[in-house]
Regions:
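Class I SAM-dependent transferase core
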Residues: 1-72, 101-115
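Residue-level signal for inorganic ion chemistry
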Residues: 29, 85, 166
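Conserved SAM/SAH cofactor-binding pocket of Class I
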Residues: 56-134, 138, 149
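Active-site capping/gating segments
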Residues: 91-94, 167-207
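Short strand-turn motif at the edge of the Rossmann-like AdoMet-binding core
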Residues: 98, 126, 142, 165-169
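Short hydrophobic/aromatic-enriched beta-strand-loop microsegments
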Residues: 121, 159-164, 185
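Alpha-helical transmembrane segments of helical membrane proteins, especially in multi-pass transport
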Residues: 139-146, 153
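A short glycine-rich, Lys/Arg-flanked "PGG" loop and its adjoining helix->strand segment in the class I
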Residues: 149-162
Length: 207
């Protein structure tokens, strides 16, 4: 069974207005893909399953905080998961991407969909980003778990939640990360790929 915009809207209960924004984002992604490699070419036809659903599933893992969550999306690339989270109203999202042409795309989507109140694009390496305290740190198809912890720790408190979609090598990544970091982690099955898991981590500290 194919999975598209209609299936996504049903699964995540999105309004017509939100659905229209997601549709426009998908159109822009396809338009800008040529020459930019925002997502893998082999996933263009399955982007709602592979990218939109994979990103949106994180919303079910967000705890009740009593305020709008502040997210850090490391290596935002084509906007997954950060732009999907912003469109769905999951909080205030800071998208960090070092490649300028990808940032131009991200900013174009923010402007087109009027997301400037909840999504901020930073064209820099995460190490150069001014420090702030994130409630949630996420990253997708960016780096291994240990590297993400290294990059994200300056923005984390002990209460910061890490939501990190990972592929089939997740077990090895967790084992390797434990060599340099202490953390609690749960591996949640992914809705978008039976081989994938979401690392839900907290209490991350260097050893």
């Amino acid at each position: 069974m194919s999975y598209g915009a209609a299936e996504f809207a049903t699964e995540f209960g999105v309004s017509r207005e939100t659905g229209a924004k997601l549709d426009r984002y998908a159109e822009m992604l396809a338009d800008w893909q040529v020459g930019m490699n925002l997502i893998g070419w082999s996933t263009i036809g399955s982007m709602w399953q592979r990218h939109f659903r994979d990103s949106a599933q994180l919303t079910a893992l967000v705890p009740t905080l009593g305020h709008r969550p502040l997210w850090l999306d490391i290596g935002a690339g084509g906007g997954f998961p950060g732009l999907v989270l912003a469109i769905l109203g999951a909080g205030d999202i800071r998208l960090v991407e070092s490649i300028t042409k990808k940032c131009r795309f991200l900013q174009a989507v923010v402007d087109e969909l009027d997301l400037d109140a909840c999504a901020t694009v930073h064209n820099c390496r995460v190490e150069a980003l001014p420090r702030f305290r994130a409630d949630i740190i996420t990253a997708r198809a960016c780096a291994n778990l240990a590297q993400l912890f290294d990059w994200g720790l300056p923005f984390a408190a002990s209460s910061t939640l890490w939501l990190l979609p990972k592929g089939a090598s997740v077990g090895h990544e967790v084992t390797t990360a434990r060599q340099g970091f202490r953390f609690e982690a749960e591996l949640i099955p992914s809705r978008s790929d039976e081989r994938a898991r979401i690392v839900v981590a907290k209490g991350v500290f260097r050893k």
